């Protein structure tokens, strides 16, 4: 049975032709977290043995709680980057309500993320009641803040902000309500995404004063974040990528080319460790990455090892009753045999043979008061029309 899928996010969701013996510019280290051995190996050739589980072929509708500290200011998606873009709407809002980014950066927003009214069981049971057949939670976004009790990222929701393991709450609620559970990971791009935090104002009374993106652990003495290293969050102890001051350049460098500053092995391995840690703790049925192919491909084998680990781990935990679904965006035909294709805010223009997914949101990917105040969030009829289009293909 063919199945097309629609994942709705609430703001409250190179192929080289060389399959073996490929040398990677930034090979991942397995010093901390070992890849689960099993049927799948970290090569495209091996991963193409993947078969989409029947449960996902039959599912049609999922809901994604794309929710984290970037919702605090109500400025919409990518606000943790945009607050460092001088003159932007997000910058102006941040300066007016919180302070100048040389003094108050995104790190200082994290304690304001309280989640004091969060009731995961109530929400997930509601999602199931309205038809959700699987549920996704945000594990981390490009802001590099982990929403669980992360042993490899000190900037996490247990240490700073809610003082709660958000993923654990979502996972328990999904299990209680009998919904397959998914986690999305986006922090691999924090390396280049946060580069504007290295900037400074070019105009006005703060001209030339550096933003907080280059602060170190030593700078925190006597401050609320004493003992924490801002570089563990911002990851900006590296040169800027080519054209970094051009705000849109990051989109051309998303696949780790076009002059992007190549991340270090330490950075790549940290993302690998965090992702494997979350997989091992919460045993998700689905994982999603906001990437071209898999994380850090083609400069690193980290993403391929994550994929192999996820599939093999799922086989062990499920005792052979395989349930794993891993999504990738902008995939070659061969890569689509190894992963499930995800199309962000769109759909193919014709029927596609294999299962695929559209991910979309009611408004912005993070809460945006402007959209709410102007009535620009999707209506129920908008969602139904999109769902019909997706499922029909």
Place the predicted regions along the sequence by residue.
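Mature catalytic domains of secreted/periplasmic carbohydrate-active enzymes
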Residues: 22-393
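Bacterial Sec-dependent N-terminal signal peptides
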Residues: 1-23
């Amino acid at each position: 049975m063919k199945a097309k899928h629609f994942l709705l996010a609430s703001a409250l969701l190179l192929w080289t032709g060389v399959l073996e013996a490929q040398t990677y510019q930034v090979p991942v280290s397995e010093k901390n977290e070992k890849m689960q051995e099993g049927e799948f190996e970290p090569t495209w050739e091996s991963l193409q043995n993947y078969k989409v589980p029947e449960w996902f072929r039959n599912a049609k509708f999922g809901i994604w709680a794309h929710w984290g500290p970037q919702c605090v200011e109500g400025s919409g998606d990518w606000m943790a980057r945009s607050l460092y873009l001088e003159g932007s709407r997000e910058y102006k809002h941040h300066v007016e309500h919180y302070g100048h980014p040389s003094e108050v950066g995104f790190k200082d927003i994290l304690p304001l993320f309280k989640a004091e009214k969060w009731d995961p069981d109530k929400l997930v049971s509601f999602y199931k009641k309205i038809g959700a057949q699987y549920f996704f939670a945000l594990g981390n976004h490009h802001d590099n803040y982990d929403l669980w009790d992360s042993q490899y990222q000190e900037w996490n929701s247990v240490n700073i902000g809610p003082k709660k393991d958000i993923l654990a709450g979502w996972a328990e609620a999904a299990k209680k309500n009998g919904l397959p559970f998914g986690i999305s990971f986006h922090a691999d791009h924090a390396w280049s995404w946060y580069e504007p935090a290295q900037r400074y104002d070019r105009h006005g009374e703060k001209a030339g004063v550096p933003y907080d993106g280059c602060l170190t652990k030593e700078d925190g003495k006597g401050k609320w974040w004493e003992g924490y290293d801002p570089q563990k969050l911002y990851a900006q102890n590296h040169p800027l990528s080519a054209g970094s001051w051009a705000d849109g350049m990051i989109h051309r460098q998303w696949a780790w080319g076009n002059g992007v500053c190549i991340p270090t092995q330490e950075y790549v391995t940290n993302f690998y460790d965090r992702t494997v840690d979350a997989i091992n703790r919460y045993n998700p049925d689905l994982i999603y990455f906001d990437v071209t192919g898999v994380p850090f491909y083609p400069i690193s084998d980290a993403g391929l090892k994550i994929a192999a680990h996820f599939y093999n781990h799922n086989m062990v935990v499920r005792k052979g009753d395989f349930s794993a679904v891993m999504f990738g965006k902008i995939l070659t035909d061969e890569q689509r045999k190894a992963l499930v294709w995800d199309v962000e805010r769109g759909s193919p223009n014709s029927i596609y043979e294999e299962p695929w997914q559209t991910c979309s949101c009611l408004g912005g990917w993070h809460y945006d008061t402007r959209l709410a105040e102007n009535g620009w969030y999707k209506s129920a009829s908008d969602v139904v029309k999109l769902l019909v289009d997706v499922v029909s293909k």
